[in-house]
Amino acid sequence: MSGPDKGSDSGQTANDPKQKKARNGQMETYSCARCRKLKKKCPRQLPECSNCLKAREPCNYPGRAPRRTKKELRDAIMKGEVLPSMRRKHRKIEKELKTADLRHLESVDDRPVNQVMGGSMPPLGAYRGGEQQYNNGPPISGIDGNDSINRGKAQSVGSYQILPPQRKSKLVLDQNPKFVHSQSSALKTNEYPVPIMSPHIANQVYPEGVSSLISALNTMNDNVSANTPIALSYLQLQKLHQEQQQIQQQQIQQQQQHQHLVQQHLQHVRADATSILPPVTSQTVYTPIPGPRTSQIPFGFTHGYTASAPPPLMQPYSMPTSPFESREKQQQFDNIQYHPVYKIPPIAARQSPIDEIIGIENGSISIDAGSITREVVNSRMKGPHSTSWVNEDGSPKPIKKSLLEKFVSAYFEHNHRLFPMVDKVTFLKKLATINSFESIEMLAVNNPELPKTFIFEIYMIMAIGCTTLQRAGKLTTDEGHLYEHLAYLAMRNFRDILHQQDITTLRCLILLGIYSFFEPKGVSSWTISGIAMRLAIELGLNRPLTAKEMGDMSAVEVESRYRVFWSAYCFERVVATSLGRVSAIDDEDIGIPLPRALYDSEKEDIEVTNLIISLRKMGGKIYKEVHSLSAGRKDITMEQKQLIIQKLRKELDDIYEEECEKRRLKGKSRSSKRFEKSKESDSDRGVTEEDVKSGNENLIGLLASDDVSMTEHGQSIDNTLESTPLPTTIPTTIVNDSVDQHSTLENIPTSATSKDQIETIITKPTANIMNDQTDSDPLPKVDNKPISNNEEGPKSLKEGNSEQNPSENISPEDVTLTKTDNSENKESSLRSNSNISFHISNVWLEMRYTQLQILLYRPSALIPKPPIESLTVLGEFCLAAWRHTYTLYKEKLLPLNWITLFRTLTICNTILYCLCQWSIDLVASTIEIQQCVEILQHFGEKWVFAMKCADVFQNISNTIVEISLSQGQDPNIDKLTRELFGASNAYLEILNENNVDVSWEDRFR
């Protein structure tokens, strides 16, 4: 502020009576803050005014803000600061700024405006107008850069904008060089003119530098007369404005058309799924339609960036190889197709086919349970890679309804017994309304109320049933691979299911988990099991229902809750136990009853379900008390540890004996019913009592077969012999400290002098394993005489075996070396009449019993180095478990999934440990080792490392044969020792290299 101004201000202040009273201490100079806020007259008393004193509010005198100079006021106006009042000097400053800007506009040169505005206009410098014409209207601000109006003068005044007069008069400095640079760069290319927005759009928030031009033109439209010379140029600008509006409308229409085409294309792709999409390789790429690139134009300044024209459609819109394809490859493709300037990105970038299936939109995950679950499943689930269900021309093959019905029937006959979460009656009623495979997808279209869960359940149940029939050998090669295609179609409906996060989501997660058993790696099963169990706990399915909740639900709904939870429990527990990991829920946190049968027809299935639950509970209990970290921290004596083992052994024996007793009684009841039916029809069919007494069982069985279901026939096969005892004591042929290490080789006849003869003798029982079983199987016979051991076992098994024929009394000559035509026919007949479900088989029951015994006795955190007595029992259980496993394998009743593979590897690892500890009969174990090799080689078709493990055991078998030829000489025993330890190390290296994550406590040295 100048000198005279300062003097005048100071003089006015000195003569102010308020200042005099303030100096005398009578009152404050200015009002308090509260009175200012309430707009009341403040008495300004000290220390508090009467207004604040009455209101009992604090009184604060802030004083007066310091006065600003003209320069400070000018800077404030330029910065757009709202001034408290508009005095004369303020208006004077604003008028000076307007006048300077008008002079700048009138002195502009004769450059064509179309270099700046993209239009065809006379130069603005050709017109002159008085200052009075512009008093009520703001000037046009310049745009910095090479294409500005008289760049030098624009920079001298400053690039600023003035808001329309309907708002408060203020000036806003344009200080956004980034946007100015982008605008000037776009103008230099002459790709598109800068749009001039209509007045009704002018209230939007536009980027700086552009809104000044738009605001100025909108203001001139209201204040400039059409008769003035400058108005002639404005009319042309207005015409240009209208042209830009038309261009904008065209762009909006193109955007809408593009979105419409995208929606039609996606609907077309979904419709193609009803006819089974052909397989697509990973080399399929999305190719844009060739054509000239549309010039860039600022479209909608809401987002503050330049958007290009609508992107072209991608051709062809091929489906991916798998719904679980790796996201890394898809992300690389998205980076090529997607450009950040697109306001609406292309189809491939906005939502890839994989993301459409799993449900990840725009490559981002919202923070909710459904989205997180989708991303987790997408990252862990590998899924099917291709399908062979196509013709040579690539068109999908038709699927017969009868084949699909077989898949569904196989699921409910086998898998439903383990996981009864699907309401069988309701599901089959809905399924009966489907006439053909092509109408499955149309169900959701024609019936919007039909949930996507039903479509998912249909496809996934058929996929799981297909794996069951494939294992049983009841499908052709092409039909056997159809499960991958069905699972692919099921995952197309998985996105909407995860959003629900309810009991239907849990049911579908369990189905997906069952299917994941057949993946080469079990990581997805572990992930899905954890998600499923957490969702079950979140829904409160493990807690008992209150009386009010029970009253609001029907009996079917209550039972459905129980079954869904126990299905999730069985699924999670089998995964955790197979991997040697802790379970997600403790048995003490479960307060609901076991499933019960609602219909008479499902009593047998529910009995199997409850047996499975008991075995799952037992496996979890063994892990918790023997293999967990807390078990290893127990500071107890060896006697106390053995008591824990004995207690668990007794519980396991009780479960086994109770189930055997049920099956024995059920078998007798069925046998008597069949005999009565056959006896009643004997007179009509010509069968006499002499035929029955003479043992003409084949004729009776043939006549009775018409009235016996497949399930009963499968059960009768298992009940032909009573179960034999399992080993609990040390056999005399077991190598230990009190027995000569070379006595195990004494069973080899002295006449056997060649390696081929030794191999023939050792592998004789393997040749007829299905017809001439080994000693502890319920079905095995050699010359129609059961083979069994003399060791004591569970009471229920021991009582039923009056006849015993120890294996050591059978010479090698009693066993045929090769299969005859009769044995082949017998094996084929047995397989054709057997059921696809093995849970009613005694062989399966004994296999699971021995596997749990292995889990109990093997080296653990509780007992890292078991005594020799325990190792002897462990070795016998390993051999028995392997015989049962091989029996189911030969009968095609062994599921070839990663659960079975990991159990197999556990047995193999334990056998190696026992061999290194000399607790298994070498010659007796050779049979089981050869069986290990055969099964591991079969698993090698999908799991490559299983083939390498088979080679390790083959080398061990060859070494044992060489030692047998040498009659147990010491150098060869040393060679075997080195071979065993070397094989053990190689075995573990193979598992580690292939990331086989199984928690084992075995230490071979």
Curated annotation (Swiss-Prot):
SMART domains assigned to the protein according to its UniProt record, in alphabetical order: Fungal_trans, GAL4
Phenotype on disruption: Causes a modest increase in azole resistance but does not exhibit altered susceptibility to cycloheximide or caffeine.
GO molecular function, one term: DNA-binding transcription factor activity, RNA polymerase II-specific
Subcellular location, record wording: Nucleus
Feature: compositional bias, Basic and acidic residues: 673-693, 792-801
GO cellular component, one term: nucleus
Main location (coarse class): nucleus
Gene3D superfamilies: Zn(2)-C6 fungal-type DNA-binding domain (4.10.240.10)
Region of interest: Disordered: 1-28, 129-151, 666-693, 763-831
Top-rank lineage group of the source organism: Eukaryota
DNA-binding region: 32-59
GO BP of this protein: cellular response to oxidative stress; negative regulation of cellular response to drug; negative regulation of transcription by RNA polymerase II; positive regulation of transcription by RNA polymerase II; transcription elongation by RNA polymerase II
Swiss-Prot/TrEMBL keywords: DNA-binding, Metal-binding, Nucleus, Transcription, Transcription regulation, Zinc
Biased composition (Polar residues): 763-773
Its biological purpose: Transcription factor that negatively regulates pleiotropic drug resistance genes, including the ABC transporter genes CDR1, PDH1, and YOR1.
The protein's name: Negative regulator of pleiotropic drug resistance STB5
Origin organism lineage: Eukaryota, Fungi, Dikarya, Ascomycota, Saccharomycotina
Gene (name only): STB5
